[in-house]
Amino acid sequence: MDNEDKISISAKEEKILSFWKEQDIFQKTLDNREGCPTFSFYDGPPFATGLPHYGHLLAGTIKDVVCRYASMDGHYVPRRFGWDCHGVPVEYEVEKSLGLTEPGAIERFGVANFNEECRKIVFRYADEWKYFVDRIGRWVDFSATWRTMDLSFMESVWWVFRSLYDQGLVYEGTKVVPFSTKLGTPLSNFEAGQNYKEVDDPSVVVKFALQDNQGFLLAWTTTPWTLVSNMALAVHPELTYVRIKDKESGDEYILGQESLPRWFPDRESYEWIGQLSGKSLVGQSYEPLFPYFQDKKELGAFRILPADFIEESEGTGIVHMAPAFGEADFFACQEHNVPLVCPVDNQGCYTAEVKDFVGEYIKSADKGIARRLKNENKLFYQGTVRHRYPFCWRTDSPLIYKAVNSWFVAVEKVKSKMLKANESIHWTPGHIKQGRFGKWLEGARDWAISRNRYWGTPIPIWRSDDGELLVIGSIQELEALSGQKIVDLHRHFIDEIEINQNGKSFRRIPYVFDCWFDSGAMPYAQNHYPFERAEETEACFPADFIAEGLDQTRGWFYTLTVIAAALFDQPAFKNVIVNGIILAEDGNKMSKRLNNYPSPKMIMDAYGADALRLYLLNSVVVKAEDLRFSDKGVESVLKQVLLPLSNALAFYKTYAELYGFDPKETDNIELAEIDRWILSSLYSLLGKTRESMSQYDLHAAVNPFVDFIEDLTNWYIRRSRRRFWDAEDSTDRRAAFSTLYEVLVVFSKVIAPFIPFISEDMYQQLRGETDPESVHLCDFPHVVLEKILPNLERKMQDIREIVALGHSLRKEHKLKVRQPLQNVYIVGSQERMEALAQVGSLIGEELNVKDVHFCSETPEYVTTLIKPNFRTLGKKVGNRLPEIQRALAGLPQEQIQAFMHKGQMVVSLGEETISLDKEDITVSWASAEGFVARSSASFVAVLDCQLTEPLIMEGIARELVNKINTMRRNGKLHVSDRIAIRLHAPVIVQEAFALHKEYICEETLTTSVSVIDYKEGEEWDINGHAVSFVLERVER
């Protein structure tokens, strides 16, 4: 494709964008549906602190398609855009830009100053977002945007929190949660699941000495830094453990029996002492590894606990427990009254209790700790292990699990409501419902919602010195209790507000909400519910539709579900489309640093937004699978789908204007069979599109477009060209124009939600004076049942299948399509052969074959060969496969032909019989000399390849027509221009020209031919003969 094509595509789309804006078409689509049923849509809010990428464009396209379709299908579809303004993404940008990276730096800079800096950069890339949203062809209402940092939004978040609190679903507690030491704050469990990486970590087995010199317990860990906080060991009471003596060291070890070969593979290296049960070990004491917390022994530390979660598939069957740094450890130690110590600060550095490593980052201390254990003869094994480990989704630093005091939403209390809500949600693809999302709900944990950060919605809890709580649910309530006017709810406006009540002083707790709490409250907060627009909010809840990426099954989809189920015992949305991830072409994550992908702007400038949209919509990424992005794939959509459609429109316009066709004057025209077929295909496609859209299956909706455009351009128009070119104003010509006009108009409306630019371009060139101003103001078409003719579609499908089969034979055996052949034999069921007999001439034209023979039996020129399909049959019959192979080899042609018709056969193996079907058999053909054969799903084609002199001469004539018309196109001649030709060619080509002169002149609009004896003009190879032409336009 040349640059001119690319420029025209981009320029044409820009022109359409201008038309939409100048005529305010989006607003008119809303006005047009005022009073119609509302289709409610929630838009997942992005952060404007980063530029949009392909993932955003993909999700935006999906949302746009569904909303456009709903609007055209008779719904009022408001599309408010929203911005996620709070949280770590914004804070992190400000910290980097201001160099506030040291602990306490933000406090020294001032929380008020810091938050105002955050406010300044929130919309850093808002203009870029608006550009890309517009350029991809997405319609949203930027004039009514909602923002999570707005006073009204934050007040509704307070109302949500207060409502949860009133239901007893909020509590304060200490739990082990994912913790980002880079941010100094806990994360939710679903945030921790968003960024796992394969990493190499230490792998150590440590020797814990039982009291009274009774040997050592061996425990394995990949986090040596937690060993300084060891408070207990755990065994499975039902597992069998062993005591052995290491011959080299003389030490006695206890470990799980099944893990023994893992750590002592050489049976001669140890002496067996005996077995003991896990239960017998429970309660025994051991010596602390480190001296830092040995005083905790009096409080119940350094004992062996029972734990039924222990497995012997890895490790030693004995688990080291640091209750401050492992959830299972925490609960086990809590149950058995083992104390908790947490000598790690919020930056991940050891505190003063661990005097030998104080101030050192815990992950950096792994080597020093292992070295010390080795020096003290407490290290049994040291190595590395490769495993998946969670990293902070924002800072890309390793997370730890840490016991922190936090505020929680009691998700586990409403788990049954969440599971019930999920049952009523329609998921696309469907497996997400009970798979990734359903399983996540089943394992849902209480949600740690408090963050010790700065730029966010403050948690509205005021606490007195004696622990009494005031939970505020509105600005009015806070103003009444504090006596102050509230103009902003951010920390630096309300942290100093003190409430005095009943002789007590209450101050706000120093936390803000997890920003996912903001987005989960979006259905209510976007409308300032319940303070304003309550009726509107309730009428549009749950949303009819949402869409985001697969990662949001543990993000926004989840938080929406938690809050909606808890507050209203309902889902937050009825239908959801989940998309996959767009990767670079090499399969890696798209990376600006690696520069491994083309920019979206470059792609849209080069190939257009429609090509990008259709490329994405017709890929696996809309089925929640990963897509390796390819700019060649986008280019292919443009060249193979959109340009042929544009060419079809140009063809219609050219000849409709040439002959003055008026679409209003088409009543009572008798249609040809091919007209009825393309209309039937159109309305069948329309029915499939409507059905697919009702199921929110965009891939199924757009996939047939490609085949239909192929049917339209490469079959209907190509097969009907002579009808359009008919100089007489015949009924047949008017039928062709009428049919093509209807197809293009209806199809422009069908594709409008999916590829809005080309559909608008088509519609504008076709619409009448009284038609709606834009294709997007039209109703989505309805199926015209009387125009759907299934038998005709099947018949044409059979013809196309046969033609494709014949062409594949020609290609395989290097027989040019322009070279006529004498015979083709089509073999199929008698019923189908009889139905196709009347279209033999059509098949002959397409295959360039003189005589088409329809047969229910394979002709004598071909022998059908069958043998077992070893891949499928081997699984069924095993070692009897050779017997079946011999039996098939001996079958007569009559039985083989019967199998070809029925698709089944019974093979005798001695006294036993085995039934075989088509998938068990591989079919091939042995052809007589001069014949070739091939099969499709329904037919066998046998092609007679023998060339006679008349066939050779006609083949040369057809090649001449092709080359002359190529020169016409290259010379920019109009379709109606007449030409004169000067020809230099060998005798055989001159003879072919003379023999088929009338045909050649008619096909090329040639009025005269002069044979010259010298080379002039462009030279061509015509079936092995060098020929040159000069073309000159002849004035009429």
UniProtKB/Swiss-Prot annotation:
**Which cofactors must be present for this protein to function?**
Zn(2+)
Q: Which UniProt keywords apply?
A: Aminoacyl-tRNA synthetase, ATP-binding, Cytoplasm, Ligase, Metal-binding, Nucleotide-binding, Protein biosynthesis, Zinc
The record, for InterPro entries, names: aa-tRNA-synth_I_CS, aa-tRNA-synth_Ia, Anticodon_Ile_ABEc, Ile-tRNA-ligase, Ile-tRNA-ligase_type2, M/V/L/I-tRNA-synth_anticd-bd, Rossmann-like_a/b/a_fold, tRNAsynth_Ia_anticodon-bd
Motif 'HIGH' region, per the record, lies over: 46-56
Top-level enzyme category: ligase
Which domain of life does the UniProt lineage start with?
Answer: Bacteria
Reactions catalysed, semicolon-separated, are: tRNA(Ile) + L-isoleucine + ATP = L-isoleucyl-tRNA(Ile) + AMP + diphosphate
What GO biological process, any one, is recorded here? Answer: isoleucyl-tRNA aminoacylation
| PROSITE patterns xref list | AA_TRNA_LIGASE_I (PS00178)
Q: GO CC terms for this protein?
A: cytoplasm
Q: Does the keyword Transferase apply?
A: no
Where is this protein primarily located? cytoplasm
Q: Which residues form the signal peptide?
A: none
Q: Which CDD domains match?
A: Anticodon_Ia_Ile_ABEc, IleRS_core
Entry EC number(s): 6.1.1.5
Any one Gene Ontology MF annotation carried by this entry is: isoleucine-tRNA ligase activity
Binding annotation for ATP: 592
Identify the residue span(s) of motif 'KMSKS' region: 589-593
Subunit structure and binding partners: Monomer.
Fill in the domain comment.
IleRS has two distinct active sites: one for aminoacylation and one for editing. The misactivated valine is translocated from the active site to the editing site, which sterically excludes the correctly activated isoleucine. The single editing site contains two valyl binding pockets, one specific for each substrate (Val-AMP or Val-tRNA(Ile)).
What HAMAP family does its record include? Ile_tRNA_synth_type2
Family per similarity comment: Belongs to the class-I aminoacyl-tRNA synthetase family. IleS type 2 subfamily.
Function field: Catalyzes the attachment of isoleucine to tRNA(Ile). As IleRS can inadvertently accommodate and process structurally similar amino acids such as valine, to avoid such errors it has two additional distinct tRNA(Ile)-dependent editing activities. One activity is designated as 'pretransfer' editing and involves the hydrolysis of activated Val-AMP. The other activity is designated 'posttransfer' editing and involves deacylation of mischarged Val-tRNA(Ile).
Q: What is this protein called?
A: Isoleucine--tRNA ligase
Primary gene name: ileS
